[in-house]
Amino acid sequence: MKRDASRVILALVAAIVVIAAAVEAQENPYREDGWAKFPDGRRLGQMSAIDVDRAGNVWALDRCGANSCAGSKVAPVIKFDATGKYLTSFGAGLLVFPHGMHVDKDGNVWVTDADGKDGKGHQVIKFSADGRVLLTLGKAGVPGTASDTFNRPSAVTTSPNGEIFIADGHGGESNARIVKFSKEGKFISAWGKKSSAPGEFETLHAIATDARGTSFARRPRQQPRPNI
């Protein structure tokens, strides 16, 4: 019996090795030209974020056919089905420099606006799946360090209990902190400052939470060490 069990284990290990080798041999990342299909021939600009909802739909964040949405009437938040078929888009005229996006467990779409111009930007906006604005954090066009202002927020995520975590800052003279809010948008706390020391940030670029609500903030490629 022990010998048979050992043979089964060896067979499983061998199978795992073969599968791992096959996966490793695949091109990563791979590219599929023409996946996104627009009915009006729209061309995409700089794509800053992408996420997938629970139904398998793909959400993309486009900088309005260019690298900025300032003065544009193009809708930057785009929804595709799993085959790349265009479903809807929204957010036109609301964002300056869309950067981070997060689709929460209820299907709401969160977007960060990491710049400011003409009285817009430096905000985090929560949209419903059909494009209604449900919540706005930060003061439009006003950079700052207070509990109700941001300076170039780069990313947003929500924890399993609905709490909101925002990576506030995008290099330069912007902020370098994590800001936490209740699910209703009430300020809870903020931490971090611009520094290369452990637990601090020079340039924030992405954020995520695990099942326990622990936040993970990522620096850009030049500073790959994450903070937890």
Label each residue range with its predicted role:
Residues 1-6:
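N-terminal secretory signal peptides that target proteins for export/translocation
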